[in-house]
Curated annotation (Swiss-Prot):
InterPro entries: Trm112-like. Belongs to the UPF0434 family. HAMAP family: UPF0434 (MF_01187). It holds the Pfam family Trm112p. Transmembrane segments: none annotated. This is UPF0434 protein Rsph17029_0141.
Length: 59
């Protein structure tokens, strides 16, 4: 949780990796969406996933 805002896990059904179009995994501890195929972790800030490759962390 960041502040008082939680990520809505139902969003995972609609979101895909912008690089591979594959599904994403949610890492609640790090507040990231993980693309295993692209080996990228997209941050979640204030409950909003930031799906920009330039903002992603390499795994």
């Amino acid at each position: 949780m960041i502040g008082n805002t939680l990520f809505d896990r139902r969003m995972l059904e609609a979101l895909v990796c912008p690089v591979t179009q594959a599904g994403l995994a949610y890492d609640a501890d790090r507040q990231e969406l993980i693309s295993k195929q692209a080996r990228l972790a997209f941050p979640i800030r204030d409950g909003i996933p930031i799906m920009l490759v330039s903002e992603a962390r390499e795994l």
